[in-house]
Amino acid sequence: MVLDGADWKRAIARHSGGVDEVWVRRVLETYRKLGFTYLRDGGDRWSVGAKARSLAGEYGITYRTPLSPLCAQGHYGGFIGEKYENLSQYAAMVSQKRAEDADFIKIMISGLMDFDRFGVLTEDGLPPETIRELIHIAHEEGFAVMAHANGARTVEAAAQAGVDSVEHGAYLDTDALRAMRENGTVWVPTLSTIGNLRGTGRFDETAVAAILESAMENVAAFAAMGGLIAPGTDAGAWAVPHGSLSEYALLEQVLGENAENILSRGAAEIQRKF
């Protein structure tokens, strides 16, 4: 909710003096007009998502938020989330999220795609044993877990640990896809964060095309396995404004005539888990 798809620094500054309720209401109204009745937020440390949750009922929307994502000190996510230095501190933060009435826990366990270089992430994922502990601790507190995760081994480790959903999931292989399917992980591939970059001139067009092709091939393979796929735009990411429906077009392109059934099944599982 905090980001706007254009300028992340400006978007964050919008709430520097407190949550801009006018902005939040404008975004909620956008989704209401589009017919959305359920939104799952990625969280932020300025309480923008929390404010959105408190207002969403006025717009006929069920709104779920982790309040803020949790990220390891020195790794990706600190610009928007809360940082922990060790597992003990993370566990205390998870307990605090329970006291603050978070709906679920979001963990940041990998870097981003480098959109100028196919196959490259901005940093490696966290160690598998750390990923397992992060998910276990949150589950023990009764939370579902959303994971920002890219890279085959990172996603495989998260799925094997029982993560409830994976957001993004770039550069997966058969083992990672199979792990998600076998463990009931819902994959939210956020294709629009890649596809919407085409033609903008911001990144290498050849690399963007290759990244998108790879992601779409994996979505098709996962669907063929019977895996759970849900639509989610990562709204607020660069070139993905709130209300953008390009994610649905991209998923329909991959999934064909079965798209509605596949996505409805995945979305229902998201709502059940979260």
Where are the predicted features?
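Active-site mouth loops of central-metabolism enzymes
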Residues: 8-23, 75-92, 144-146
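N-terminal small/glycine-rich loop or linker at the start of catalytic domains
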Residues: 1-10, 61-80, 131-132
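Metal-associated gating/positioning segment near the N- to mid-region
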Residues: 1-54
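Glycine-rich, aromatic-flanked loop segments that form ligand/cofactor-binding clefts
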Residues: 44-72, 188
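Histidine/acidic residue-rich metal-binding segments in metalloenzymes
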Residues: 88-109, 113-187, 208-229
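Active-site environment of divalent metal-dependent phosphoester hydrolases
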Residues: 2-4, 45-49, 71-72, 111-115, ...
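His/Asp/Glu-enriched, well-ordered alpha-helical/loop segment
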Residues: 140, 203, 212-274
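Non-cysteine beta-strand/loop elements that form the S-adenosyl-L-methionine
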Residues: 1, 64-69, 102-110, 185-193
